[in-house]
Amino acid sequence: MPSPTIGTSSADEAPGLEQGTMRRVTNRLMPFIMLCYFVAYLDRVNVGFASLQMNKALGFNAAAYGFGAGLFFLGYCTCEVPSNLMLYRFGARRWIARIMFTWGLCAAAMAFITGETSFYTVRTLLGMAEAGFQPGVLFFITLWFPEAYRGRVLAMFLASIPISGVIGAPISGLLLSLDGTLGLQGWQWLYLVEGAPAILLAPIVAIHLQDSPSQAGWLEDRQRDWLVTRMANEKRQIEGRRTYSILQALTNPAVLFLAAIYFTNVCLNNGIMFFLPQIIKGFGNSNTQTGLIAAIPAGVALIAVIWLGRRSDRRQERYGHAAVANLVGGGALLASALLQDPVARVAALALAYAGTISFSGVFWAIPGTFLSGVGAAGGIAAISAIGIIGGFTAPWFVGALKDMTGDFRWGLGAIGCLAIVAAAALYAFGRRRHAEVMTLVTEGTQR
């Protein structure tokens, strides 16, 4: 069920101009955006490594830890749509810089929590501060990259997640070894050191990014003119099918369905990430060994997200690729709950993590095929805000079942089953959407 190609232009007559323009845009924007998301994701999930010392030091059981870890997403979802609308109003450059500065402060403040109340409070504030960053960047990408390029570009952006695991997991393990240095515990050093980069990057964002291609002085005139024209043509074609206001986008059945699917993927992702260090350490590993082993699933995911994004672009198909990724993630997580051998369990968790991360790179190319302008800003934020509730639900659910049963298997197995059902639903939905689009194309041709 290939997605229809949108917005052909004069690039058909001058492929060198298109290739040169998109290469320059990609090289200018994506490495820096990836760096910012690397820092964001590290600050979001480093609580998993901090828990190896923090839980004992502050007296948290698995349910209290899972609840507090998940509160990040409750704060995130309450502020996500307003934050993305502010980005649309004030521009990505200024708003993303504001987001990074405030989340950096909150991430560093995690070093000074003293119990459950302060843990819950600061995690919620961290979520509120970071709200809007991911959907804001996703919206920013729709302003700079034609639809045909978004699968691979989004894969690059979301590759920051496994990169943060490959690099961040060993670093986090080593930071825990600073326990006692200057009177601070290892988990406190982890929060302080990993929170600082966001604060330092904030002013650079304000300088490095531009809000739209028309402001890109680093492009040649003909490149800038081509990109502005291409993006305007695509926007007109999308709006020619139907223009969505912010309210219509927020209540659109397709948006709500995609939000529900994203919810299952967020459950899958965070069910793995917040407890993976504890699972690995439970096999008898040290903190440093845990960090090194935890980098393995991230490395597998890095390969998967880039490969699937490129394949999706070549086929110009999104729904089926995303469905298969969620199916692989859910099936592998279920397998990890059934396996006994530690090596086999880590391998299954690596495959599950690869599925959940590669899903996102393809999935986020879907909303831009039927939303644009303020409708895209609101719709993307709504999908993210509703779906991100899974980030609150999954850690609490897995932690509570761990306290009840003494094992992580029950919670992880249940989340795996949920992801499998969602994969089937997404595939069926994609086939129906493709049929509807092809009907519109046929009717337009007949006219």
Question: Locations of the language-model features?
Answer:
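Structural signature of the two symmetry-related core transmembrane helices
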Residues: 94-108, 320-335
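Cytoplasmic helix-loop-helix junction between adjacent transmembrane helices
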Residues: 122-159
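Extracytoplasmic gate region of multi-pass secondary transporters
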Residues: 47-48, 247-305, 360, 364, ...
